[in-house]
C-alpha cells in the first residue's frame, strides 16, 4: 500500500471533498447514529477528513479532548471542526500511547490501511478499559460497476477492497473487545459517467495499485459500456458496500476490582 500516494490524493481533494463526498456524508450520519448521545472523556477520530463525522460527534463530547486525526494535512487545512484538535498523522501509526482515549471513531478511512488486522487492533488498544468505538469502512462490492467496466474496456482500475467476512472475523477475534458488526449497501447516482468520475476525483477516491494508461478510445468504450450496463432512468449508478462495527474494549478481571 502506497500511503504517500493516498495522502497526495486526499491533500489535493481538500477543497472539493465536502461537495463530492455524498456517500461519505451518509455513512458519517449512519455511524453517528450508532454512537452515544453523550460521550465523556477523550475522543480520537481516525480519518477525520473534512469533518463530516467530527461535526456530528464533537458537540456530544464532554470533559475531554476531541482529537481529529487525518493522514492528509490538506484535508485538515480545509476542515471546519469547531471544538476539535487537528492532528496530521497516519492512523496506522498514531502518535499516542495505549489507554489514552475513552472513545474511538472512524468513518470511510480504515479500508485504506495496509495492514488492517494489526492496525485496527492497535487502534483499539488506544482505548481505556470500558472505552467505546464506532467504525465504518468500505468492503468488497464497492464500485463494482466501475470495476466491471474497467475490466471490460481496459480503462482505469479500482482499489481492491477486502470482503466483509474479513472484518467480521477480525472484530470477532480481537482480544478484549466486544463488537457488533453489520453491513449496509448504498447506491449513489450521477447525471453522467463523467460526473461520476469527477465526483470520485473530488472526494480523493482515485488511488489504485495498478494505474493503466488511458487512451481516448478506451475512455469512450468505458463510458459507452457503463451507460449501457448501469444507467437507471437517465442516471448512472455506483454502489458502496459498508461494514459498521461498534462496541467496547472490555475491562479485565483485575480492572473490575
Residue ranges, per PLM feature:
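A short glycine-rich, Lys/Arg-flanked "PGG" loop and its adjoining helix->strand segment in the class I
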Residues: 117-132
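Class I SAM-dependent methyltransferase SAM/SAH-binding core
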Residues: 44-94
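A short acidic, Gly/Pro-enriched loop at the edge of an enzyme's catalytic core
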Residues: 92-104
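Conserved catalytic/acceptor-binding region of the Class I
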Residues: 130-193, 206-216
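Conserved alpha-helix/loop element of class I SAM-dependent methyltransferases that forms part
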Residues: 22-40
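N-terminal, positively charged/glycine-rich alpha-helical extensions of SAM-dependent methyltransferases
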Residues: 1-13
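A short SAM/SAH-binding and catalytic strip from SAM-dependent methyltransferases
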Residues: 103-116
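Conserved Class I S-adenosyl-L-methionine
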Residues: 50-52, 178-257
Amino acid at each position: 500500500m502506497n500511503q504517500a500516494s493516498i495522502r497526495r490524493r486526499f491533500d489535493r481533494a481538500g477543497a472539493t471533498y465536502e461537495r463530492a463526498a455524498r456517500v461519505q456524508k451518509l455513512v458519517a450520519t449512519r455511524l453517528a447514529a450508532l454512537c452515544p448521545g453523550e460521550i465523556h472523556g477523550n475522543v480520537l477520530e481516525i480519518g477525520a477528513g473534512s469533518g463530516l463525522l467530527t461535526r456530528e460527534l464533537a458537540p456530544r463530547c464532554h470533559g475531554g479532548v476531541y482529537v481529529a486525526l487525518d493522514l492528509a494535512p490538506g484535508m485538515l487545512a480545509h476542515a471546519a471542526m469547531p471544538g476539535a484538535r487537528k492532528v496530521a498523522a497516519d492512523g496506522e501509526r498514531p502518535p499516542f500511547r495505549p489507554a489514552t482515549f475513552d472513545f474511538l471513531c472512524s468513518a470511510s478511512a480504515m479500508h485504506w490501511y495496509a495492514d488492517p488486522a494489526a492496525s485496527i487492533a492497535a487502534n483499539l488498544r488506544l482505548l481505556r478499559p470500558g472505552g467505546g468505538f464506532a467504525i465504518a469502512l468500505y468492503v468488497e462490492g464497492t464500485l463494482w460497476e466501475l470495476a466491471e467496466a474497467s475490466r471490460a474496456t481496459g480503462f482505469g482500475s479500482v482499489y481492491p477492497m477486502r470482503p466483509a467476512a474479513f472484518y467480521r472475523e477480525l472484530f470477532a477475534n480481537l482480544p478484549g473487545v466486544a463488537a457488533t458488526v453489520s453491513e449496509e449497501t448504498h447506491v449513489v447516482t450521477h447525471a453522467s459517467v463523467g460526473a461520476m468520475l469527477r465526483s470520485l476525483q473530488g472526494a480523493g477516491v482515485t488511488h489504485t495499485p495498478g494505474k493503466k494508461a488511458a487512451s481516448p478510445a478506451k475512455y469512450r468504450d468505458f463510458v459507452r459500456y457503463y451507460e449501457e450496463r448501469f444507467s437507471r432512468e437517465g442516471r448512472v449508478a455506483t454502489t458502496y458496500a459498508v461494514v459498521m462495527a461498534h462496541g467496547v474494549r472490555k475491562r479485565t478481571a483485575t480492572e473490575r476490582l
